[in-house]
Every structure is written in structure tokens, then in C-alpha cells.
């Protein structure tokens, strides 16, 4: 008789047909809430409808149902992303000068939008070179298309159609996984399987397939393009994939196939998997062979990482065990209890993810200019400035979002009864020490950083330049930053074998790289001016963190309002009869944090814009003389507040202010309009609810007189709604103003 061990049961991880598909229900506004579904009595109804439509916590308290809604919504999000991408590729296929740009990227600007001749607006179609008239784009799509090996507008058209198919597929998946086969809660909480798929699947196989595409398609096509071959003469991508001899003509070791790989003779592949560092002097971008090598290495790391966690086979790490093994000398039980928080509160999980993704986005912003990844990106100054600014704003918003969801977690998902003495509890118990120390740091940084500028303005005003903090008088050199730069500049040849240049030309040491008479990149000198503005960065970042962290740590209770958790995430004040308790909700901290985030990012992008125009961007003569756009005035002008106002804001605004009558005039209109949107926000931020309610009742009286009064009673915005509308217009107006100012300037002079 053979005794077999019992077969492991296969877990059923989906429910079939859990929720019927009902168009009648979807057609009813507010179907997710009993109160809202009744329809409007007052105009507040439309605000509540928008506030709660995606607040799945308010629809149900069942974690499984909430998880399914979030999961389904993610597919909707992906569908929109594919739709947007399809639109970008379609514009490239149908309305752009991509093929012309590809044949001469140094003299022709990228354009993918041609304005129709209505009311004379065709003036916006500027001459971008090569006889093409259109709006210059600054998204970097042309550069990424060239890097990926796209050589014709037909290929863009096919990709656009493919993206539409994927958009439809994602919409279907969102419906299918909510209405037809919805995952159970256990599936959402199986973190090891999730890590397996995300690390090995998305990141590992994703990077591997991109590396494969780069080696087999991008590298050979870019090799031909760099050599000046007409794009129409270059073989099509599938020919390189199917015909190995074609590749072997460019990279002889291809003839040997996979033999060197299996015989561990990997150096054979060093023709197309390189480790050079620095920039390709032809295109001013990173070496594409370095990039292919990088993605192959990343793929291997993530394929290994994806197999480190215990799934169906009972081998490998468990995340809960790893977390609970982490104990420091001062942390008591260590990370015990964190696993339960992160698998039962999606807000806590989202908060961590937003904080990391936001930081990563800001890191991307800094790498896009210091290690420009795509061909001819570094010399397209308008695109460089746009990419930096865009990624900085996005990163700022994501980090504020991290604080918002951390606070929502504290209010809605935190259970103090079973959280006793874990790490989070220990942080909360000494929150006063954290916040008061952080407050001291903010005061110190604010007074000292601003004080250095005020000193310089005063000395400058009194005609005492020898007493100013500057590179030519009292020097405050950023010695630590210079040491880091120097270390990196000396690194090649010492760290990685065969590396000929440092990771970025900005570190120093290397020569400058110029493409078509324009500077791509050169060593960036740091001096007193940078020291001063970096301390302003430190100040604004710390204040933003102070506001956001105070909102999180005091989200449930404070000395002022011990029962804050009962009032919820957003509330205007602690009821009538308790003065001085307004603006204390966690939501209000996010609201205030947004303004300081805007402050912080504005200083960063202003610093970047001026520094690059002054010390990096410019033209180079045949004799090798570099002429920078603003002639190196950053070091001496940016050390006073007056210098920032006079030589940056005012001097560089001339292009946008004088843009009327030119192809840049749309930026002039946007500059004006966005200032108006910004000013409009102040009406919401500086006036109270009662003022508007009085006005509304007077207007309603007039409507009653004329017998045109609506059935839905008009109401003034609530305090929280007013603040939300205010901060939205403040940020939108401010960002659009900056966008118009930057682009009109850099397109005109860059």
C-alpha cells in the first residue's frame, strides 16, 4: 500500500459574477451613496457628489469590496494612459515634422501641432526649420522615438493604433475583474506573490525585453542614423530581428550567437554592451550601448529579486518575518505590527508608495539634464527645462499626497488598541519632541538663509561690495558639494573596469560636449551663490515637511482637540462655541502644505533655469569659445534678492511680455490668463462663507421677483470647499504662469 502525502488544495482566489452590470444604476448620479442618490436639494449636492465619488471608504466598510473598486479603477487609469499615449503617437504620425527632424535634429526643431487658420491664430505656427511651420513641442517625444529606433511616421501611426487596442483591453479588464471575476481579499493581501510578479514580471522581464529591443532594434538603427544614413534607406526593425547577418555586419560578435553567453566568454558582447560613461559626442546623449547594458543588468537583478520571497513552494523569505526581525537598540519590538498595517490599510500602503515615487520623480528630474538619456535631448534647451520643471512639480504633488494618505490612514484605519508600543506608537508618543525640534530647525534655516541674502542686499545698497558674501568678497564655498563633485570626477578607471568617463559631465574633470555648435553639457561650477540658494531649498523643504508631518502626527488627537479622530479627516472647526479651533483638521494641513510645496518647487526650478542659462547652456565658436545665454551672471547676480527680481524674473520675462505679434504670443496670453487664475484664487482664500451666503440670498430674492428661481436652493461653498477651490486655482495659476514665462524665454533664446 502506497501512502501519499495529501495534495495541497488549490486556493480559489476569485469570486465569479459578484456584481451585476447595470447601466440603469450607473446612470443614476450618486448611486454609491444613499444620501446623494436622493438627488439635489441644494447646490452643495454637486460638491458632495464629486468629493465622494472616488472615496471608496465612504461607499462601504468592507475591505474586500474597497480593494476590488481600487483594483478596477487602476485598469481605468491604465486605459486613460494608453489613450493619452496613443494621442501623442498619433500627433507624431499625422501632424509632425518627425521625419524632417530625424534627418537634421540640430537645425530643425520638433513640432507636432499645426494650428488651423481661424481668427488669425495661424501666427502661432512658427518656423521650426526645414520649411515646416508649427508649434514647437517640448515633451521630448521625438528624442525618445529616435532612441527607440522609430524611423517613419507610419511606424508611429501603427503604434498609436496598438495603444488604442490596449486602452480598450484595459477598459475591458477593469469591468471583467469587478463584475465577472473579482479577486478575493486574500489575493490582494498575498504580498509575496505580488512581489514575485511585480519584481520578476514587470521590472525584470520588462527591463529584459527593453534591453532586447535596444540591442536588436535601437542600436543598429541609431548606428545608421549617427553615420548620416537616410532614414528611408535603413532596414526596418523586423529585418534586424529576423536576419542575424545584418546585425553581424555592424557588431561582428553577433555572428557567434549565444555561444559566448553559455561559455561565459561574455567580453565578446562588449561591442554593444558597453561601460563607457559620459556622453556620445555625436548626439549629446548617453551612449545607447551603455543604456542597453544597464537595462540588461537591472533585468538580472530584478529577476533574482522576484524569486526571493516565499510563494506556493514554501521556500524563501516571508515579508512579515523580515519586518518583525528588524529590531534596533532603541526601537523595542521593532517593526512588529507594520505588516498588519500595510496589508489592511491601503492608505498606509499608498502613502509609502507616494513618498517613494515622489522622491524618485525628483531624482528623475535631476538625472534628465545631468545624464541626458536620449539623442539630441541635451541641446534642446526648451525640452530640458520643461522636463526638469515637469518632474519637479509632479514629485512635489506626490509627496504632499503621501502626507495626505498617511493622515487619512491615521484617522480612518489606525486602531490604537492593538498598536500599543509598536514603532508607530513610539513615534506618536514623542511627536511633541519631533515637531518642536523641526520647528526650531525651520526658524534657524529661515532666518539664516534669508539673512545672508538680506545682508548682501544691504551691503549692495550701501555700495559696499567688498563686504558681501560672494565669490569675489567673503566666500562661502559649498565645500562638501565640491568634494562630492571631485570624487565623482576622479572615479573613472578606479571603480568600474573599462569605464572611460564619469557618470555625468557635470561632476567636472571632463571636457565639454557640444553638438551642432550648442553646448550639450559641461562641468557645472558651484560657488557662493549656490550655497545661498541651497539653504533656501533646505528651508522651504523643512517647512513643507513640518506642516505635513504635524498634520499626520496630530491627525487623531492634540492637546487642543483630544477627540480629533471623531471629527474625521476634514472639518472646518471644532464646532461653534470653541473658538480658535479652525484649520486644525488633517485636510487643512495638506491644504497649507500645498502652498509650501509650491514655494519649495518654485525656488528649485528658478535656480535650475537661471543656473543652466548662466553656466551651462550656450553656443560654442569654431575657436572653442563658449558664450552662455546669460553670460555667467548667476554667480554675482543671484546673491541678492534684488538680483533675483531684476536679473532673473524681470530681465527674463521680456520675451513673454513682448511676445504679442509673434509665434510665441500664445505664451503671452497664457502668462496674462494664468496670472488672472492665480488672482482669482485669492477671492476664495481671503473671504468667508457668510459674505457669499448674504450675497446669494439677495440674488435669489431677485430671481424670485422675476419668477425664475431654481428648484435647487443655491448655497455658498462650505469653508473646506472654498479652500479647495482656492488652492486649486492658486497652484494652477502659478504653475501655468511659470510655464508660459519659462517657455517663451527659452524658445526665444535657446
UniProtKB/Swiss-Prot annotation:
It is an enzyme of class 1 (oxidoreductase). GO terms for biological process: photosynthesis. Coiled coil: none annotated. [4Fe-4S] cluster binds at residues 573, 582. P700 is a chlorophyll a/chlorophyll a' dimer, A0 is one or more chlorophyll a, A1 is one or both phylloquinones and FX is a shared 4Fe-4S iron-sulfur center. The chain crosses the membrane at residues 70-93, 156-179, 195-219, 291-309, 346-369, 385-411, 433-455, 531-549, 589-610, 664-686, 724-744. Keywords: 4Fe-4S, Chlorophyll, Chloroplast, Chromophore, Electron transport, Iron, Iron-sulfur, Magnesium, Membrane, Metal-binding, Oxidoreductase, Photosynthesis, Photosystem I, Plastid, Thylakoid, Transmembrane, Transmembrane helix, Transport. Its EC number is 1.97.1.12. PROSITE patterns: PHOTOSYSTEM_I_PSAAB (PS00419). Its main location: plastid. GO terms for cellular component: chloroplast thylakoid membrane; photosystem I. One of its GO terms (molecular function) is magnesium ion binding. It is found in: Plastid, Chloroplast thylakoid membrane. Phylloquinone binds at residue 692. Chlorophyll a' binds at residue 675. It catalyses: reduced [plastocyanin] + hnu + oxidized [2Fe-2S]-[ferredoxin] = oxidized [plastocyanin] + reduced [2Fe-2S]-[ferredoxin]. Chlorophyll a binds at residues 683, 691. It is a multi-pass membrane protein. The PsaA/B heterodimer binds the P700 chlorophyll special pair and subsequent electron acceptors. PSI consists of a core antenna complex that captures photons, and an electron transfer chain that converts photonic excitation into a charge separation. The eukaryotic PSI reaction center is composed of at least 11 subunits. Belongs to the PsaA/PsaB family. HAMAP family: PSI_PsaA (MF_00458). PsaA and PsaB bind P700, the primary electron donor of photosystem I (PSI), as well as the electron acceptors A0, A1 and FX. PSI is a plastocyanin-ferredoxin oxidoreductase, converting photonic excitation into a charge separation, which transfers an electron from the donor P700 chlorophyll pair to the spectroscopically characterized acceptors A0, A1, FX, FA and FB in turn. Oxidized P700 is reduced on the lumenal side of the thylakoid membrane by plastocyanin. This is Photosystem I P700 chlorophyll a apoprotein A1. It comes from Olimarabidopsis pumila. The gene is psaA.
Amino acid at each position: 500500500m502506497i501512502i501519499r502525502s495529501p495534495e495541497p488544495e488549490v486556493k480559489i482566489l476569485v469570486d465569479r459574477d459578484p456584481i451585476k452590470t447595470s447601466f440603469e444604476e450607473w446612470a443614476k448620479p450618486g448611486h454609491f451613496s444613499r444620501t446623494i442618490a436622493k438627488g439635489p436639494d441644494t447646490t452643495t449636492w454637486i460638491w458632495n457628489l464629486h468629493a465622494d465619488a472616488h472615496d471608496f471608504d465612504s461607499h462601504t466598510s468592507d475591505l474586500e469590496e474597497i480593494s476590488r473598486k481600487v483594483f478596477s479603477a487602476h485598469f481605468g487609469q491604465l486605459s486613460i494612459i494608453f489613450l493619452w499615449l496613443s494621442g501623442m503617437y498619433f500627433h507624431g504620425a499625422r501632424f509632425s515634422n518627425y521625419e524632417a527632424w530625424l534627418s537634421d535634429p540640430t537645425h530643425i526643431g520638433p513640432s507636432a501641432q499645426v494650428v488651423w487658420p481661424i481668427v488669425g491664430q495661424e501666427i502661432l505656427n512658427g518656423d521650426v526649420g526645414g520649411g515646416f511651420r508649427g508649434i514647437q513641442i517640448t515633451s521630448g517625444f521625438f528624442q525618445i522615438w529616435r532612441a527607440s529606433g522609430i524611423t517613419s511616421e507610419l511606424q508611429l501611426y501603427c503604434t498609436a493604433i496598438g495603444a488604442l487596442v490596449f486602452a480598450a483591453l484595459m477598459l475591458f479588464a477593469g469591468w471583467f475583474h469587478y463584475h465577472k471575476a473579482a479577486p478575493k481579499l486574500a489575493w490582494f493581501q498575498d504580498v509575496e506573490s505580488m512581489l514575485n510578479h511585480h519584481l520578476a514580471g514587470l521590472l525584470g522581464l520588462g527591463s529584459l525585453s527593453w534591453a532586447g529591443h535596444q540591442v536588436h532594434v535601437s542600436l543598429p538603427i541609431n548606428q545608421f542614423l549617427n553615420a548620416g544614413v537616410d532614414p528611408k534607406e535603413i532596414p526596418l526593425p523586423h529585418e534586424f530581428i529576423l536576419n542575424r547577418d545584418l546585425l553581424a555586419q555592424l557588431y561582428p560578435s553577433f555572428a557567434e550567437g549565444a555561444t559566448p553567453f553559455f561559455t561565459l566568454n561574455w567580453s565578446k558582447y562588449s561591442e554593444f554592451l558597453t561601460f563607457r560613461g559620459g556622453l556620445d559626442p555625436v548626439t549629446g546623449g548617453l551612449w545607447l550601448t551603455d543604456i542597453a547594458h544597464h537595462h540588461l543588468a537591472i533585468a538580472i537583478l530584478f529577476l533574482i529579486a522576484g524569486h526571493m520571497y516565499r510563494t506556493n513552494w514554501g521556500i524563501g523569505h516571508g515579508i512579515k518575518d523580515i519586518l518583525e526581525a528588524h529590531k534596533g537598540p532603541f526601537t523595542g519590538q521593532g517593526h512588529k505590527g507594520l505588516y498588519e498595517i500595510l496589508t489592511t490599510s491601503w492608505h498606509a500602503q499608498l502613502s509609502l508608495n507616494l513618498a517613494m515615487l515622489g522622491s524618485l520623480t525628483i531624482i528623475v528630474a535631476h538625472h534628465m539634464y545631468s545624464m541626458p538619456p536620449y539623442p539630441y535631448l541635451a541641446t534642446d534647451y526648451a525640452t530640458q527645462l520643461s522636463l526638469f520643471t515637469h518632474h519637479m512639480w509632479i514629485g512635489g504633488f506626490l509627496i504632499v499626497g503621501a502626507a495626505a494618505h498617511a493622515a487619512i490612514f491615521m484617522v480612518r484605519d489606525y486602531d490604537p488598541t492593538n498598536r500599543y508600543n509598536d514603532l508607530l506608537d513610539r513615534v506618536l508618543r514623542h511627536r511633541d519632541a519631533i515637531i518642536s525640534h523641526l520647528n526650531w530647525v525651520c526658524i534657524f534655516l529661515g532666518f539664516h538663509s534669508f539673512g545672508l541674502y538680506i545682508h548682501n542686499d544691504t551691503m549692495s545698497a550701501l555700495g559696499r561690495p567688498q563686504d558681501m558674501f560672494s565669490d569675489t568678497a567673503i566666500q562661502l564655498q559649498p565645500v562638501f558639494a565640491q568634494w562630492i563633485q571631485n570624487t565623482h570626477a576622479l572615479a573613472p578607471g578606479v571603480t568600474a573596469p573599462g569605464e572611460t568617463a564619469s557618470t555625468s559631465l557635470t561632476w567636472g574633470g571632463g571636457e565639454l560636449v557640444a553638438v551642432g555648435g550648442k553646448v550639450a553639457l559641461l562641468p557645472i561650477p558651484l560657488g557662493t551663490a549656490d550655497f545661498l540658494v541651497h539653504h533656501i531649498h533646505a528651508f522651504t523643504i523643512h517647512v513643507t515637511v513640518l506642516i505635513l508631518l504635524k498634520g499626520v502626527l496630530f491627525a487623531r488627537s492634540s492637546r487642543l482637540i483630544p477627540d480629533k479622530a471623531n471629527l474625521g479627516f476634514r472639518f472646518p472647526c471644532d464646532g461653534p462655541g470653541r473658538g480658535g479651533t479652525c484649520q486644525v483638521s488633517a485636510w487643512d494641513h495638506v491644504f497649507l502644505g500645498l502652498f509650501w510645496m509650491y514655494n519649495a518647487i518654485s525656488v528649485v526650478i528658478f535656480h535650475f533655469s537661471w543656473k543652466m542659462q548662466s553656466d551651462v547652456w550656450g553656443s560654442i565658436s569654431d575657436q572653442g569659445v563658449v558664450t552662455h545665454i546669460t553670460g555667467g551672471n548667476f554667480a554675482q547676480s543671484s546673491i541678492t534678492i534684488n538680483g533675483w527680481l531684476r536679473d532673473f524674473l524681470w530681465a527674463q520675462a521680456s520675451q513673454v511680455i513682448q511676445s504679442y505679434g509673434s509665434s510665441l504670443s500664445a505664451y503671452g496670453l497664457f502668462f496674462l490668463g494664468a496670472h488672472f487664475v492665480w488672482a482669482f484664487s485669492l477671492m476664495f482664500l481671503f473671504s468667508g462663507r457668510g459674505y457669499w451666503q448674504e450675497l446669494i440670498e439677495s440674488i435669489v430674492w431677485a430671481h424670485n421677483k422675476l419668477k425664475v428661481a431654481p428648484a435647487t436652493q443655491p448655497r455658498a461653498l462650505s469653508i473646506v470647499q472654498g479652500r479647495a477651490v482656492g488652492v486649486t486655482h492658486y497652484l494652477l495659476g502659478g504653475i501655468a504662469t511659470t510655464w508660459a514665462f519659462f517657455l517663451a524665454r527659452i524658445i526665444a533664446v535657446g
